[in-house]
């Protein structure tokens, strides 16, 4: 019972970590490429949406 759960959580957290790094990279790219427009997309609501999407992709 513990082994499949361990495997699932290992893959889940590894994928989530990689996806978070990708999201941070995209965010930094946009901040460099379009600095004026980047501030419009950085709010609590958009951060929550981005984090939720990353976790949903990781679970799926």
From Swiss-Prot:
Interacts (via C-terminus) with MPDZ. Detected in aorta, renal artery, jugular vein, vena cava and femoral vein. One of its GO terms (molecular function) is G protein-coupled receptor activity. This is 5-hydroxytryptamine receptor 2B. Its main location: membrane. A motif (DRY motif) lies at residues 27-29. Ligands are bound in a hydrophobic pocket formed by the transmembrane helices. GO terms for cellular component: neuron projection; plasma membrane; synapse. Residues 27-46 are cytoplasmic. Belongs to the G-protein coupled receptor 1 family. Keywords: Behavior, Cell membrane, G-protein coupled receptor, Lipoprotein, Membrane, Palmitate, Receptor, Synapse, Synaptosome, Transducer, Transmembrane, Transmembrane helix. It holds the Pfam family 7tm_1. The keyword Cytoplasm does not apply. Residues 1-4 are extracellular. G-protein coupled receptor for 5-hydroxytryptamine (serotonin). Also functions as a receptor for various ergot alkaloid derivatives and psychoactive substances. Ligand binding causes a conformation change that triggers signaling via guanine nucleotide-binding proteins (G proteins) and modulates the activity of downstream effectors. Coiled coil: none annotated. Ergotamine binds at residues 10, 15. Gene3D superfamilies: Rhodopsin 7-helix transmembrane proteins (1.20.1070.10). It is a multi-pass membrane protein. InterPro entries: GPCR_Rhodpsn (IPR000276), GPCR_Rhodpsn_7TM (IPR017452). It is found in: Cell membrane; Synapse, Synaptosome. The chain crosses the membrane at residues 5-26, 47-60.
């Amino acid at each position: 019972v513990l082994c499949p759960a361990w495997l699932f959580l290992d893959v889940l957290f590894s994928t989530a970590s990689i996806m978070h790094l990708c999201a941070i990279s995209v965010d930094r790219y946009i901040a460099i490429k379009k600095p004026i427009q980047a501030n419009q997309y950085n709010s609590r609501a958009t951060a929550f949406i981005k984090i939720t999407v990353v976790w949903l992709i990781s679970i799926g």
